[in-house]
């Protein structure tokens, strides 16, 4: 999906900011971003969603699966309180402590643009109902999500708990 490519460019910018200031921060960002990306990629692969217009056709999908995709997209976009917000929050704290507010403002604004597209995609998944479904050869209900995909989804959704645990340790 092209959206994943554009999102990767945005995340690359955040990783470069983290890399310039703190090596551990960069590795933390990369690890969490990889976890979230793998979660989304596995879901898209399980349901054979390779193009943007195919995502609109998942109206026939189980509402729980649609909700998981929605939450994972918001997490990947960096919306609080999901796990995807944690690395950005750490970079924000680091840049604020180093008084690099100009670059921080630009990064946050660009992230809001990316988050807008994730919200638009999520809205399309829930609200639009496309009945024409010529690209699928199998019934979407017959496809099962792998246990690994489910585990990754719940980890990315449970970001608030991980953030709280992170601050309790510090």
From Swiss-Prot:
Q: What is its main location?
A: mitochondrion
Q: What is its EC number?
A: 7.1.1.2
Query: So what does this thing catalyse?
Result: a ubiquinone + NADH + 5 H(+)(in) = a ubiquinol + NAD(+) + 4 H(+)(out)
- Pfam families documented for this protein: NADH_dehy_S2_C, Proton_antipo_M
**InterPro entries the record matches:** Complex_I_Subunit_2 (IPR050175), NADH_DH_su2_C (IPR010933), NADH_UbQ_OxRdtase_chain2 (IPR003917), ND/Mrp_TM (IPR001750)
This protein's UniProt keywords? Electron transport, Membrane, Mitochondrion, Mitochondrion inner membrane, NAD, Respiratory chain, Translocase, Transmembrane, Transmembrane helix, Transport, Ubiquinone
Annotated compartments: Mitochondrion inner membrane
Membrane-crossing ranges are 24-44, 67-87, 101-121, 150-170
The UniProt GO MF terms for this protein read: NADH dehydrogenase (ubiquinone) activity
Q: Iron among the record's keywords?
A: no
Q: Name one GO cellular component term.
A: mitochondrial inner membrane
Which GO biological-process labels does this protein carry?
mitochondrial electron transport, NADH to ubiquinone
Coiled-coil portions: none
| Membrane topology label | Multi-pass membrane protein
UniProt similarity note: Belongs to the complex I subunit 2 family.
The UniProt function text for this chain reads: Core subunit of the mitochondrial membrane respiratory chain NADH dehydrogenase (Complex I) that is believed to belong to the minimal assembly required for catalysis. Complex I functions in the transfer of electrons from NADH to the respiratory chain. The immediate electron acceptor for the enzyme is believed to be ubiquinone.
**Protein name per Swiss-Prot or TrEMBL:** NADH-ubiquinone oxidoreductase chain 2
The organism named in the record is Anopheles albimanus
The major lineage groups are: Eukaryota, Metazoa, Ecdysozoa, Arthropoda, Hexapoda
């Amino acid at each position: 999906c092209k959206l994943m490519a554009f999102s990767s460019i945005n995340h690359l910018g955040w990783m470069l900011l983290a890399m310039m200031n703190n090596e551990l921060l960069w590795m933390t960002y990369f690890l969490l971003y990889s976890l979230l990306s793998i979660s989304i990629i596995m879901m898209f692969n399980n349901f054979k969603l390779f193009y943007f217009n195919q995502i609109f056709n998942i109206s026939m999908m189980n509402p729980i699966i649609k909700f998981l995709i929605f939450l994972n997209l918001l997490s990947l976009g960096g919306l609080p309180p999901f796990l995807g917000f944690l690395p950005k929050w750490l970079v924000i704290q680091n840049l604020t402590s180093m008084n690099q507010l100009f670059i921080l403002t630009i990064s946050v604004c660009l992230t809001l643009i990316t988050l807008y597209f994730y919200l638009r995609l999520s809205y399309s998944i829930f609200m639009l109902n496309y009945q024409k479904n010529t690209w699928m050869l199998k019934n979407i209900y017959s496809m099962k999500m792998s246990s690994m995909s489910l585990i990754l989804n719940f980890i990315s959704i449970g970001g608030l708990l991980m953030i709280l645990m992170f601050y309790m340790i510090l």
